Amino acid sequence: MKIKATIDRIPGGLMLVPLLLGAILHTAAPGTAEYFGSFTKGIITGTLPILSVWFFCIGASIDLRATGTVLRKSGTLVLTKIAVAWVVALIAAQLLPEYGIEVGMLAGLSTLALVSAMDMTNGGLYASLMNQYGSKEESGAFVLMSVESGPLMTMVILGSAGLASFQPHHFVGAVLPFLIGFALGNLDHDLREFFSRATQTLIPFFGFALGNTINLGVILDTGLLGIAMGLLVIVVTGIPLIIADRLIGGGNGTAGLAASSTAGAAVANPVIIAQMNPAFAKIAPAATALVATCVIVTSILVPILTAMYAKRMGNPMPAQHGASAGKEKMAPEMH
């Protein structure tokens, strides 16, 4: 059977197919991990440790000479994404009730839901797409995307200063595996080549684990509003990200479009913020459902749109990027 070849024909399939399988399992049998326990539970719920190892390998695969490119690319994408979410918050604050719409077709729509869906990029999805359609440096450009993680940026954008404190050691913890891998890969070329091979191997594993955090039933709960909001996230953040990538990041826009998704971790933001500020408690459940739907919609559409855009731009294969950037051997390309 040509299972791998079939998956390769699907845009972002190495990430998307396992993610959908995980979401189906989580929806149909949410207690599977607890029932079997042990190693099976580890594969189903191991998003964080799997991503940690993958993050280490990504760091090891990047040449020291690419540092400037990585920082410029990641800084451009992160700042653009946050700026867009901030502008959306300003506009939404003028058009929507303080704590969201409670009745009608738009019931559940709130500034909290919009900002939570737009200010965090799915770093794993972005990096896996760049591993296919970009360079290693672009794949590693999500090093600064950890700044977006958690409720901090959402709370700052919402004007809730003082309700949450940012602990520097949490940021250090987020980038430490990458930095250790980066150091080892640059100290020893053989280690760089060795760890680089694992970058693609781990993608379906964290895709499956991430899928097991998503319940497909949320689409039914939020209806067309959730789907429309997912499309809005791609359009509203994607266009500025493409422009910024072309004008500032030094790319052709592919990385910008690949960053126009909603992070799975963003689903937790409304509840966390509501715990810190009870005023948001009433709208947190609806906001959570909307953000979860955005995760599903963007996880499906962003790989497809990125593949179409990359083809239109005539992107070279990853191996060609790696040769021009670092003259080093790269992991087998993911089609």
Swiss-Prot record:
Job of this protein = Catalyzes the proton-dependent uptake of 2-keto-3-deoxygluconate (KDG) into the cell.
State any single GO MF term.
2-keto-3-deoxygluconate:proton symporter activity
Q: Which NCBIfam families match?
A: kdgT
Reactions catalysed: 2-dehydro-3-deoxy-D-gluconate(in) + H(+)(in) = 2-dehydro-3-deoxy-D-gluconate(out) + H(+)(out)
The entry's localization annotation reads: Cell inner membrane
Give the family from UniProt: Belongs to the KdgT transporter family.
What organism does the record attribute this protein to?
Tolumonas auensis (strain DSM 9187 / NBRC 110442 / TA 4)
**Keywords, sorted A to Z:** Cell inner membrane, Cell membrane, Membrane, Sugar transport, Symport, Transmembrane, Transmembrane helix, Transport
Q: Which Pfam families match?
A: KdgT
User: Do you know which HAMAP family this protein is assigned to?
Assistant: KdgT
Residue ranges annotated as transmembrane are 10-30, 42-62, 77-97, 100-120, 141-161, 163-183, 200-220, 224-244, 254-274, 289-309
Q: Which InterPro entries match?
A: 2keto-3dGluconate_permease, 2keto-3dGluconate_permease_sub
The answer, when asked if Lyase is one of the entry's keywords, is no
One Gene Ontology cellular component term attached to this UniProt record is: plasma membrane
Taxonomic classification? Bacteria, Pseudomonadati, Pseudomonadota, Gammaproteobacteria, Aeromonadales
How does it sit in the bilayer? Multi-pass membrane protein
Q: What is this protein called?
A: 2-keto-3-deoxygluconate permease
